[in-house]
Each structure stands twice: as structure tokens, then as C-alpha cells.
Curated annotation (Swiss-Prot):
The keyword Ribonucleoprotein applies. The lineage of its organism: Bacteria, Pseudomonadati, Pseudomonadota, Betaproteobacteria, Burkholderiales. NCBIfam families: S16. One of its GO terms (biological process) is translation. InterPro entries: Ribosomal_bS16, Ribosomal_bS16_dom_sf. Keywords: Ribonucleoprotein, Ribosomal protein. This is Small ribosomal subunit protein bS16. It comes from the Bacteria. GO terms for molecular function: structural constituent of ribosome. Belongs to the bacterial ribosomal protein bS16 family.
Length: 91
């Protein structure tokens, strides 16, 4: 099964997360298929805190990837829309 989840980067006390598509069996920060965005929880001022490539997100959801609860929350926070797999297949 393929999942869309966060992969932690950054240094101690300065977290930075990549939003990645990976096989569910692979460890959190291990090998991934594709990086589709990032989340910086400590972004300040003019820094970009969240970026998700919408067309790649739609593609992976369309082929059956499951997003983690945290990624779903970030998608809603970023204003992106999640299209149900059935809607993508019908199009």
C-alpha cells in the first residue's frame, strides 16, 4: 500500500517535514517514491510554511494512495482540495 505522509528533517529542536509518497512498509524517514511538498512548523514572517503540489497530490490519491491524518489536516489548512479516487477515475 502506498501512503502520503510526513518525513522528518531539520536538526534538533528545528523540525522540518517533507510530504512524501512512500510504501507503507518503509520507515518514516526512509526511501520514498516522490516528494510532493513540505511543511515548516516554525516558519516565521514571510517564510513559506506549507507547500503541496496539487496535481501530484491529485494523481497519487487517484491511484489509491492513502493520506495520513496529519497530512489530511495540512491539506485542509493549505486550502488544497482532495478529490476522491472514484471521481478521478471517472474523469
Amino acid at each position: 500500500m502506498v501512503v502520503i505522509r510526513l518525513s522528518r528533517g531539520g536538526s534538533k529542536h528545528r523540525p522540518f517535514f517533507n510530504i512524501v509518497v512512500a510504501d507503507k512498509r518503509v520507515r518514516r524517514d526512509g526511501r520514498f517514491i516522490e516528494r510532493i511538498g513540505f511543511y515548516n512548523p516554525i516558519a516565521k514572517g514571510g517564510e513559506e510554511g506549507l507547500r503541496i503540489v496539487q496535481d501530484r497530490l491529485t494523481h497519487w490519491i487517484g491511484v489509491g494512495a492513502q493520506a495520513s491524518p496529519t497530512v489530511l489536516r495540512l491539506i485542509k489548512q493549505g486550502g488544497a482540495t482532495v478529490v476522491a479516487p472514484a471521481a478521478v477515475a471517472a474523469a
